[in-house]
Amino acid sequence: MIPLSIRVPASTANVGPGFDSVGIALSLYLHVVVKEKSDKWQVIHSFEDSIPTDDKNLIVSTACKVCPSLSPHIIEVTSNIPLTRGLGSSASAIVAGIELANQLGKLNLTIDQKVQIATNFEGHPDNVAASILGGTVIGALDGKNVSVVRIESKELGVISLIPNEELNTDESRSVLPDVFPFHEAVKASAISNVLVAALCQKKWEVVGEMMERDHFHEPYRLELVPLLPSIRKCAKEFGAYGTALSGAGPSIFILTPYEKRQEIAEQLARVFTSMKVCELEIDHRGITVNKKEHIGL
């Protein structure tokens, strides 16, 4: 068969008040290389032992749900996306599985279909839509209907502060309230609206202000990520636009002027020595498929 490789970017979700809606693709990647057919699915990887190497692997199980008639293959998976750190590792695996089914099953899925399927699996469009489309996305899931808008944000730099500790998404969601008072919802929604408008109009200072005024989730998750306020304060002093939890955490996501990202990252690394400080870029390509040769990490 023609060698096939799939590359899926990481993502950050929410960007503060854009809860389960706003996502940004990042320059960390999951790679899947499809090898020969086999009598059963085999996943070659060097991750921790808890990650399955058979058809229970999230990439393979997703692919088989999308196209149950797929012939088993041996696939090799590599990734520099940290697991359970709020950088879309599970979303990237779901997106990779959909593309694996699309390629091997010759499904000819459209971009919109991929986003719809991925959102149905994930439950919200922010991470998966960003990984599929690249750039910054704003999405909404209403019942089974998904609407997504993509915008460019090439003037922005990204820094991620990644702790050593993991934080399971289910655990992080468990601290959120079941009921949100109407007046709080109005306030939180207005802030989110201004965030999206500022992203579209490239008013980065306003973006930074809004992403630090979330009411939907960050106030409830602070107990799980206690360093967020001090990181936010330092990042602002160093010249960043704004700081927020990356997805459900525990990683911290910072938007900066593109030309200042390295300087700000170096300053933060000197202060927060217990965390891994990554200077990243926004990925503008989204998922890519290479049928000729695989370029590894």
From Swiss-Prot:
NCBIfam families from the UniProt entry: thrB (TIGR00191)
Gene3D superfamilies: 3.30.230.10, GHMP kinase, C-terminal domain
Gene name as annotated: thrB
Disulfide bonds listed in the record: none
Lineage of source species: Bacteria, Bacillati, Bacillota, Bacilli, Bacillales
Protein name in UniProt: Homoserine kinase
Family, as annotated: Belongs to the GHMP kinase family. Homoserine kinase subfamily.
Catalytic reaction(s) noted: L-homoserine + ATP = O-phospho-L-homoserine + ADP + H(+)
EC number of the protein: 2.7.1.39
Role this protein plays: Catalyzes the ATP-dependent phosphorylation of L-homoserine to L-homoserine phosphate.
Alphabetical list of Pfam families matching this protein: GHMP_kinases_C, GHMP_kinases_N
Species: Bacillus cereus (strain AH820)
Compartmental location: Cytoplasm
Pathway: Amino-acid biosynthesis; L-threonine biosynthesis; L-threonine from L-aspartate: step 4/5
Residues that bind ATP: P82, L83, T84, R85, G86, L87, G88, S89, S90, A91, S92
Domain of life: Bacteria
Keywords on record: Amino-acid biosynthesis, ATP-binding, Cytoplasm, Kinase, Nucleotide-binding, Threonine biosynthesis, Transferase
GO molecular function: ATP binding; homoserine kinase activity
InterPro entries: GHMP_kinase_C_dom (IPR013750), GHMP_kinase_C_sf (IPR036554), GHMP_kinase_N_dom (IPR006204), GHMP_knse_ATP-bd_CS (IPR006203), Homoserine_kinase (IPR000870), Ribosomal_Su5_D2-typ_SF (IPR020568), Ribsml_uS5_D2-typ_fold_subgr (IPR014721)
An annotated GO BP: threonine biosynthetic process
GO cellular component, one term: cytoplasm
